[in-house]
């Protein structure tokens, strides 16, 4: 595993969300096919309640690994949250 990604995971585990986000962005900028990095960034966005960004990153994970269950669940949970907060968005 990439040392920078390990650092981002450690920051995330210590609830340093902004630092973890910045670090994982470096990983993704150097390796856009790193599904593990997108998954971590999705988790960070989810914890920061940035639902759209989380869904985008979960979608990127699914492009790389279509069978990833965490990404599928994450998208559904974010959709449910958005549906609760903004029902007009899905039911015009």
Placement of each model-derived feature along the sequence:
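Canonical positions in the second alpha-helix
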Residues: 26-27, 60-61
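Helix-start (N-cap) detector for alpha-helical repeat units in TPR-like alpha-solenoids
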Residues: 1-2, 35-36, 69-70
């Amino acid at each position: 595993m990439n040392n920078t990604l390990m650092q981002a995971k450690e920051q995330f585990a210590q609830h340093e969300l902004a630092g973890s986000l910045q670090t994982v962005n470096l990983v993704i900028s150097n390796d856009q096919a790193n599904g593990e990095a997108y998954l971590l960034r999705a988790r960070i966005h989810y914890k920061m309640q940035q639902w759209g960004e989380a869904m985008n990153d979960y979608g990127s994970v699914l492009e790389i690994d279509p069978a990833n269950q965490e990404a599928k669940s994450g998208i559904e949970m974010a959709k449910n949250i958005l549906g609760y907060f903004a029902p007009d968005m899905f039911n015009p």
